[in-house]
Amino acid sequence: MFTLKKSLLLLFFLGTINFSLCEEERNAEEERRDYPEERDVEVEKRIIPLPLGYFAKKT
């Protein structure tokens, strides 16, 4: 039981660190973008491939 708690605590701690690093990187990317057109293209890249990839795998 004790080793299970230690393992879960370690996973939670590492996950929290990983999430905070990803969030910092994402914020840095958003700050680097100067033009709103670039931001719109990035949003399209994130949204559109997901449904297209989903339907492509089903056929």
UniProtKB/Swiss-Prot annotation:
Predominant location: secreted
Annotated signal peptide: 1-22
tRNA processing keyword on record: no
Keywords: Amphibian defense peptide, Antibiotic, Antimicrobial, Cleavage on pair of basic residues, Secreted, Signal
UniProt tissue specificity: Expressed by the skin glands.
Annotated compartments: Secreted
Entry GO CC: extracellular region
Disulfide bond sites: none
Pfam families, per database record: FSAP_sig_propep
Family: Belongs to the frog skin active peptide (FSAP) family. Brevinin subfamily.
Protein's UniProt name: Dybowskin-1CDYa
Native source organism of the sequence: Rana dybowskii
